[in-house]
Amino acid sequence: VTAREVIENTSGLDAAKQSDGTYAVPAADKIIGYVRNALVVAEAQSKGITVTDDEVNNYMQTNFKTTDVSQVASAYKLSEDVAKKLINDAVIMKKYRDSVLTTTLPDAPQAPTAPEDGNSETTSQEYAQYIIGLAGDEWDAKNNTWASQDGDYYKQLSAYSISNDSASYAAAQTAYQVAMSKYSAVASKASQEWSQKINEILGKASIAVYSLAL
């Protein structure tokens, strides 16, 4: 791995160029990060993981709100070839991550929409359904009440008046906080599991940083 490769795939050559026309040697953490990603991609590919154009486009649309590689390259001051490779590698790593993790990471909860008047006591069916959607089987829709008093949502929302048809924005906010707490706990577990997997991959490699030249 050369310094040029690291610069091209991190900051981009144009952005890294100094006023005197030279380039600073990449920091060790950037070098390690670049090598780490390359090793993960290689491991994924050895397991037969590939990506399709549709998967790449979906990833770009989700993360960059465009499927035009040139726009992404321009925004990050990268060449189109480098931008395309980085995006492709990111999709490969995501697919590999999803395939090896035993912890399933759900979608992050979305915050409820605040009422136009800013009054947290504003009630609506929308807020009720928002809470019920998060609470899942903790809510008994047939009987229009909590299914039990053991769940996390009940413990935080029991003081609020909630029905199938009405709940306050304040209650919805509290439900969102419960959902985020649950999500963060799962995300932390998934992150730890992923870190362990990366360490396993890195443990198979020997990395030494020597003097580098462009």
Where are these regions (language model features)?
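N-terminal secretory/membrane-targeting helices
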Residues: 2-4, 94, 102
